[in-house]
Curated annotation (Swiss-Prot):
It comes from the Eukaryota. CDD domains: QPRTase. NCBIfam families: nadC. This is Quinolinate phosphoribosyltransferase [decarboxylating] 1. Pfam families: QRPTase_C (PF01729), QRPTase_N (PF02749). Pathway: Alkaloid biosynthesis; nicotine biosynthesis; Cofactor biosynthesis; NAD(+) biosynthesis; nicotinate D-ribonucleotide from quinolinate: step 1/1. GO terms for cellular component: cytoplasm. The keyword Transmembrane helix does not apply. Involved in the biosynthesis of pyridine alkaloid natural products, leading mainly to the production of anabasine, anatabine, nicotine and nornicotine, effective deterrents against herbivores with antiparasitic and pesticide properties (neurotoxins); nornicotine serves as the precursor in the synthesis of the carcinogen compound N'-nitrosonornicotine (NNN). Involved in the catabolism of quinolinic acid (QA). One of its GO terms (molecular function) is nicotinate-nucleotide diphosphorylase (carboxylating) activity. Keywords: Alkaloid metabolism, Glycosyltransferase, Pyridine nucleotide biosynthesis, Transferase. Substrate binds at residues 141, 172-174, 196, 206, 239, 266, 298-300, 319-321.
Amino acid sequence: MFKVFPFTAIGHPHAITAPRLVVKMSAIATKNAVESLVVKPPAHPTYDLKGVIQLALSEDAGDLGDVTCKATIPVVMESEAHFLAKEDGIVAGIALAEMIFAEVDPSLKMEWSISDGDKVHKGLKFGKVQGKAHSIVIAERVVLNFMQRMSGIATLTKAMADAAHPATILETRKTAPGLRLVDKWAVLIGGGKNHRMGLFDMVMIKDNHISAAGGVSKALNSVDQYLEQNKLQMGVEVETRTIAEVLEVLDYASRTKTSLTRIMLDNMVVPLSDGDIEVSMLNEAVDLINGRFETEASGNVTLETVHKIGQTGVTYISSGALTHSVKALDISLKIDTELALEVGRRTKRA
């Protein structure tokens, strides 16, 4: 049975009739809608979902709007369209779809039989949108682009999060340019956790930083001094690639007051020729750290290997594959043909 999920509509009177689609969105309405969500999108200091939706709609509309709709679909035609899952998976992007539909035409009404994060099976009709057919078709591709990508990310995240237990699965910064908020939101919907949003919200000392600084200890010392001088408090993670580097980090931390919070254990998972993995180095590193810092395994993480990695005792497992090469979930949105024809006959356009 379908149930209606309330959503604050965002007006855009020219989305259908104006020759040029200039997207505007109320920041207050967007904030209120986001705050009501069960799984809220992550925050960013310089842009938000408003900006993401603006760009997606405006790049589709160009300077003339939907010329095909103008030629073939009467503006007054009313219809409804159904969301259909064409394969099994976890659906994500329902809340974002509502924001997009409301931006194109606030009179559109949406009903859903599921929520973000729920599982769907092939052939399930899980939602519908009712209103002007013109508006539905204008929003269709943008809505599906987001929903299919987000659902693909959420589906893989759910599978990896379940397999990784008791470790927590994280994504990385390997997201689609301009879509990091959306990609990371999908990870949350799928049951994962977010790594740092960008370069600004966590110190992450990687191999290039270590090489430029002259070693692990020097890099850590520089970070500690920088944070203290600038009165900054944030998480600090350092990448290690060998047991020797792990020991160097632990030695530094034993001698120095440090802001270090997490140690990355990079590529300590060794793939074997038979498809299995060797995790003895990872086990040794986790034992040496012994809970003094959070640990994060990275490298050679797949759906097939993540369970064994999770059993080593690491706190986190990060995987770029969650977002950088995810397979979109096949979802369609089809207008009710009979209803459209009936209205079309009345308007002499069918």
